[in-house]
């Protein structure tokens, strides 16, 4: 697949490795900021050796054949297995809006969102509500005693302060 440059991502990255701009930035970090450029962006092997996990993950699969985004470091380490993977098998509760999903979180009745369930919000993508931001949901889940045990799947987006197992930007979006 081509990028906006007309080249593949691989071609762009290979060019960047040898570019004068990259050499300048690495030198600037080293000389002016006293930062080792090799410690700023690392390959997976070096990051793992230092005990770091992926910041973001871009999985594809049967639910997201065109891809999705997970802010991996926002997932509570207590729900990550020994392989470093978050897994959740549970009942999927599907909502057409953030407002409807919030009702299930706030409910005190039988429709209340339960531990282990998977919260799915559809119609929040570009064609739907225009990529609305789902912070209300992630903030509400953070304040549930069992919120870290609930996964959120959506075609909408997340803010930088969102926490938990949030799989967003799912493509294709529900209304595609």
Show where each model-derived region lies:
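Catalytic or ion-coupling anion/metal-binding cores of large enzyme and transporter domains
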Residues: 1-165, 169-176
